[in-house]
Amino acid sequence: MKRSVTILMTVVLALMLAGCASTAIDTTGGRDGSSFAKAVIVGSVRAEYLYIDRNWKDSKIASQVVTENDGKPYDVVSITTKDGQAKNVYFDISKFYRKKTYADDLE
């Protein structure tokens, strides 16, 4: 019985964490990261790297720069795909850029 409860709690925790990760990346409305207009909305730099890893497995980060477009902050991450193609991926970082970080956010 104790083992069943442990397994159930582990599954519930895993599902909760998976749900949190998916809400940190917003690709609705055709947001594919191909331009400022189609920038992927993210809640953290970690979400940027997760998005890149999910969409361009085994790519390499060439550079990352913070810039503004129409008064809004963006991260532009330059990657080299595994087949050697250079590509820029645009992220809307307005949810967290220059916002106060609390100790609870770091856990």
Predicted segments — roles?
Residues M1-M9:
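Bacterial N-terminal signal peptides that target proteins for export
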Residues M16-G19:
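C-terminal motif of bacterial Sec signal peptides marking the signal peptidase cleavage site
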Residues A21-T23:
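Bacterial signal peptide processing site
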Residues I25-T27:
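Intrinsically disordered, low-complexity, charge-dense segments enriched in Lys/Arg
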Residues D32-S34, L106:
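Extended, charge-rich alpha-helical interface modules
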Residues S34-L50:
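Solvent-exposed, low-complexity, repeat-rich "mucin-like" stalks and linkers
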Residues R54-V65:
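Charged, amphipathic alpha-helical segments
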Residues V66-E107:
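Short, compact, well-ordered microdomains
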